Amino acid sequence: VVNKPRNKGTSAESAVVAYLRDNGFPHAERRSLTGATDKGDISGCLGLCIEVKYANSGLKLGPWLTETRVERFNSRADYGVLVVKPAGLGDRNTAYWYAVMIGEEFAELSAKAVANSPAILQIKHGEPTTLNTTVLRAQLTRGIQPGQLAGYELLALTMRPPGSKENPDAWYRVLTLSHMVRLVRAAGYGQR
């Protein structure tokens, strides 16, 4: 019996591994399942816990980020990154998949990255908006179009999950995978 959801997840993980290997993380590989002490889907990215989700049936960022955070602690990683394959973006567009972090961790990581590379990295922050798949895709697509960002800028959208209106540390920060990789590399992760 073929397990289609598992096959889709495996395919998404493999696409992320290929992208990471081509962009400064040559030791990235799919991690075998470890049950209750799961440490994320991708290993070989020292200091990072990377969880990958195939989201054709909708975004479940809250539960997925909770899972990513638990796996981050299990793996003793510095940061947890949730990579989401959205509907309509196949393996050839892995660079445009969503990379999501909790606001508190993103603030720490981005401060580190900007401190390491102040002349070559700036983060363009999107206005906080409520969590909505259509809005997210439209803002990311529009924000990364040619002419919207300087070569040294990264776009980080801000999504407010329900009940977090006054707590920016709990907001979700959403980038494309290509922008997240540039951010973590600027913060000192991956090969130099």
Please annotate each region the language model reported.
Residues 1-192:
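Catalytic phosphate/metal-binding cores of nucleic-acid and nucleotide-processing enzymes, i.e., regions
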